[in-house]
Amino acid sequence: MLNTTPINIDAWLAENSHLLQPPVNNFCLHRGGFTVMLVGGPNERTDYHVNPTPEWFYQKTGAMTLRIVDEQLSGAARFRDVTIREGDSFLLPANVPHNPVRYADTVGIVVEQDRPAGHFDQLRWYCRGCRELVCKYEFYMSDLSSQVREGIERFAASAEDRVCKHCGTLNYPTPQASAT
């Protein structure tokens, strides 16, 4: 049966904002061809997600920082921050590593395409000391409401995965006061 019931976002948030929980703080409103998510802040994650399809961001309340890795550059210059302010939309191209940083009392909407067969997502962690790749998990994304969280929990549970092979720095699944 065709769903013809609109969702009032403000009313939904007033009743359900408690569902936006760390580390990802997302709730999937719609699925089927695309997934439409509400995402609140603050979130608690240090991973960079690599999506084989584009992602559309709309910042409803407050501002967020989208940390990206421009793989056409080298060294520290490849790490860039994109500020998405209240009312802004931003289309992130496919295959760009990104870490959404959401602050307290902020809400955004993110739209992602369903993944084509044979296309895989990645969660990556870069060393907070030397910025080299520390760990990478690759998987077929079938459930945005759980798989990113599960990857973060897997990284948190493995001290071996969190130690940089280049400089020996221990990395964390959540932001630390001393993290760069």
Curated annotation (Swiss-Prot):
A divalent metal cation binds at C127, C130, C164, C167. It catalyses: 3-hydroxyanthranilate + O2 = (2Z,4Z)-2-amino-3-carboxymuconate 6-semialdehyde. This is 3-hydroxyanthranilate 3,4-dioxygenase. Substrate binds at E55, R102, E112. Its cofactor is Fe(2+). The lineage of its organism: Eukaryota, Fungi, Dikarya, Ascomycota, Saccharomycotina. Keywords: Cytoplasm, Dioxygenase, Iron, Metal-binding, Oxidoreductase, Pyridine nucleotide biosynthesis. It is found in: Cytoplasm. The gene is BNA1. Catalyzes the oxidative ring opening of 3-hydroxyanthranilate to 2-amino-3-carboxymuconate semialdehyde, which spontaneously cyclizes to quinolinate. It comes from Eremothecium gossypii (strain ATCC 10895 / CBS 109.51 / FGSC 9923 / NRRL Y-1056) (Yeast). It comes from the Eukaryota. Belongs to the 3-HAO family.
